[in-house]
């Protein structure tokens, strides 16, 4: 308390959101690919052409999983006059089911399916075409796609490793240190 501290930042490396989760495998990405990092508050989108990230075509949509949670809460109140706990919704989004009345499940599923349809509509706005490219989904929103829509498993890849981003940053940091000759 009352002590001023001064720091010097020696260097900063910046990467597009979601990139670290696929960095160790990006060289395997042949042809056109799209990366969608669907987090709690945003969906970050990046095109990757033959393993090369297209930094000029990165987009952020304020359309994360929390918006789906809010829509479920709203529809549950409108249709059933029920104030549903967000923990129930979170478990439902992760597993595809919940221990609630069937009428409630129908509302929750319908709302989530509409949300997932909107994810794909927004991806198409950024030139996603499943016939021309593969889609790689990272982040918590991948479970929504996995649980609430049909998709071509040969063209859409969902990385549900919750540590993928941290592992990717470790991989990238190691690459950078090695390229600088610091092999510690």
Where in this protein do the model-derived segments appear?
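Nucleotide/phosphate-binding catalytic cleft detector across ATP-hydrolyzing
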Residues: 1-33, 52-67, 87-184
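Active-site-proximal alpha-helical scaffolds that flank and shape metal-associated catalytic sites
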Residues: 36-40
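Short beta-strand scaffold segments in enzyme catalytic cores
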Residues: 43-47
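Long, charge-rich alpha-helical interaction segments
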Residues: 70, 74-78
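Short, basic interhelical loop/turn and adjoining N-cap
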Residues: 80-83
